[in-house]
């Protein structure tokens, strides 16, 4: 039978709102299945089919049609109930084990901080978590709050010039010139790591990323007051990518250990959601003590091996200092919970004063308050595994909570807090009558295009030494995990056995399917990048390291470069993919990505990834 009743399709555009009724999709799928099954039964058992009226000429007998409809009604209701109940099991499981697969990705943008000039500078580092506000958004004039995700090191530098030129010997040189400020405080400056943001459209920014991370051959420095401005080689200086690793995570995480374990998967999710996050590089190794007194200019000459990918051009506007990603998250107290003796699950709602567009993102704390004594009793998160039980049943807290994201009655995502613990174990017990929940929230329910039009220009926290702030990129729209279908089961299968099942079946379709789990944007450009993977195969090699022999599995991936925004975009995709396939490494073998660009094009062997940490 050709009909697949496990994947109900939309009914035809007829009748009473067929496109809007979910139940009709199940009902029509069951009816199609029953009719086709009836035809097969009539062919295989003609006498039995004749007795029940299934082979009568002309229209099908009313009794047969009514039987079909009654059976389809019951089974479609049952199937819809099962499909509706499955997320109640799978969604909390995903949120607990792999939280990045089930949480909203709030709006993101790149923020630039402009330091104060004309006064004595206070050497400072701006910590992550500082808040900035947007201009009024939407018809109600909602102001969105963003927070910085990384620390910003303020340095006495201004970008004066940037560009590429050809030397007399035919080598391409990138020149970065900075103004040195506040020379009276030069001795306390630390210029050993200068962070640069590569600003521009995707082909330009990714081409600069590829140049700085792959093609640097040597770095020299010129200072007008030193040796009459002659070039001084600095072999110890390097340029490193600054957008990778758990320390560069865009969103807050529950546990640092789990964040490190899931770094490869979260990096792929960040790549599709906000690629600008990877357009940061660090100029490392410059010694500020070598700057002579009174120097006002610092110029770096970077010799690269080949031409800039795509022959893109750039200027000082493409090299920015003091930038960081910011995310639309704010802390607030949710509406108080009034527990009763019958329920354990309570929805978490933002206060009315925050606006109707605010939705909870994560729970920070849950506290019960005794109204008679004003004494507070904190709840422990079940994710910390400190709830009462086992050998520590006499020492653990009496209260714990579990927060999860579920699909509400209206189809929107809602946060639910489950209260439990030893004090709640007895039937009918009500240990607390007033519970407050502190949450992280975002403006995810704003009209989606309204966020794209906002500007982030107003500091809401103290930015020491900063004159003004503004966003360099348009804020992204919030992204939600895919709903419906088999997304939850695909995620569970993806992480099953630490990816060994996926590796054993690895081919182009499997890899494309794995990457599609991390693309929530529905963007045609991202879809083309995934579809550009044409073939995948595995081979094995051994490598002798000292007295041991390492076994290495090579994941060979062939891509079509036309699916990307230039050679630089291919380079960034390769770096992210190399990190991602490292998830398949285990204690029996290491994993290496080998990337082939087109037919007869260049190939690149990436460093192999070796399993570290626990056995599981």
Each model region followed by its residue ranges:
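Short, low-complexity Pro/Thr/Gly
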Residues: 183-396
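Short, Φ-rich (hydrophobic/aromatic) sequence segments
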Residues: 63, 67-74, 93, 212, ...
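Short, surface-exposed linear segments at secondary-structure transitions and domain or protein termini
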Residues: 154-159, 247-251, 460-471
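Extracellular ectodomain segments of secreted/surface proteins
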Residues: 63, 75-82, 100, 161-171, ...
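Extended assembly-interface regions of large multimeric machines
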Residues: 2-227, 231-236, 240-243
């Amino acid at each position: 039978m050709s009909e697949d009743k496990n994947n109900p399709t939309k009914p035809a555009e007829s009748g009473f709102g067929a496109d809007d009724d979910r139940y009709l999709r199940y009902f029509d799928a069951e009816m199609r299945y029953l009719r086709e099954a009836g035809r097969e039964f009539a062919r295989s058992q003609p006498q039995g089919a004749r007795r029940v009226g299934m082979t009568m000429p002309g229209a099908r007998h009313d009794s047969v049609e009514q039987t079909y409809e009654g059976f389809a009604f019951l089974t479609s209701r049952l199937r819809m109930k099962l499909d509706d109940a499955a997320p109640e099991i799978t969604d909390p499981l995903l949120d607990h084990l792999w939280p990045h697969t089930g949480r909203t990705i709030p709006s993101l943008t790149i923020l630039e901080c402009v330091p104060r000039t004309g006064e004595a500078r206070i050497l400072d580092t701006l910590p992550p978590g500082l808040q900035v506000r947007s201009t009024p958004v939407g018809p109600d004039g909602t102001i969105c709050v963003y927070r910085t995700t990384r620390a910003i090191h303020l340095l006495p530098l201004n970008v004066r010039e940037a560009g590429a030129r050809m030397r007399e010997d035919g080598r391409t040189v990138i020149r970065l010139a900075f103004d040195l400020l506040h020379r009276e405080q030069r001795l306390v400056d630390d210029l050993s790591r200068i962070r640069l943001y590569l600003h521009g459209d995707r082909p330009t920014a990714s081409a600069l990323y590829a140049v700085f991370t792959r093609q640097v051959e040597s770095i020299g420095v010129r200072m007008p007051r030193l040796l009459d401005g002659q070039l001084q080689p600095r072999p110890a200086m390097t340029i490193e990518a600054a957008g990778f690793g758990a320390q560069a995570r865009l969103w807050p995480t529950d546990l640092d250990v789990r964040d490190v374990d899931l770094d490869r998967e979260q990096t792929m999710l960040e790549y599709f959601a906000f690629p600008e996050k990877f357009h940061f590089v660090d100029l490392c190794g410059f010694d500020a003590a070598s700057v002579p007194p009174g120097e006002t200019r610092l110029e770096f000459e970077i010799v690269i091996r080949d031409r800039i990918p795509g022959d893109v051009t750039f200027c000082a506007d493409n090299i920015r200092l003091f930038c960081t990603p910011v995310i639309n998250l704010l802390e607030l107290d949710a509406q108080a919970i009034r527990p009763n003796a019958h329920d354990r699950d309570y929805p978490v709602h933002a206060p009315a004063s925050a606006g109707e567009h605010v939705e909870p993102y994560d729970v920070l704390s849950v506290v019960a308050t005794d109204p008679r004594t004003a004494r507070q009793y904190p709840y422990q998160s079940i994710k910390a595994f400190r709830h009462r039980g086992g050998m520590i049943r006499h020492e653990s807290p009496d209260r714990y909570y579990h927060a999860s994201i579920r699909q509400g009655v209206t189809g929107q995502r809602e946060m639910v807090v489950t209260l439990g613990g030893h004090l709640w174990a007895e039937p009918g017990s009500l240990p607390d009558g007033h519970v407050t929940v502190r949450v992280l929230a975002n403006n995810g329910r704003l009209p989606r295009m309204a966020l794209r039009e906002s500007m982030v220009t107003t500091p809401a926290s103290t930015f020491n030494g900063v004159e003004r702030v503004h966003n360099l990129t348009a804020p992204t729209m919030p992204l939600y995990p895919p709903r419906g279908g088999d997304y939850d089961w695909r995620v569970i299968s993806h992480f099953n056995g630490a990816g060994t099942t996926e590796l054993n079946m690895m081919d182009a379709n499997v890899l494309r399917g794995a990457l599609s789990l991390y693309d929530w944007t529905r963007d045609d450009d991202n879809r083309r990048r995934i579809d550009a993977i044409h073939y995948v195969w595995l081979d094995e090699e051994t490598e002798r390291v000292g007295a041991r022999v390492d076994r290495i599995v090579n994941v060979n991936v062939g891509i079509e470069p036309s699916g990307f925004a230039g050679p630089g975009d291919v380079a960034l995709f390769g770096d992210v993919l190399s990190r991602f396939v490292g998830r398949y490494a285990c204690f029996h073998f290491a994993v290496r990505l080998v990337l082939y660009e087109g037919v007869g094009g260049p190939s690149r062997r990436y460093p192999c990834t070796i399993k570290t940490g626990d056995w599981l």
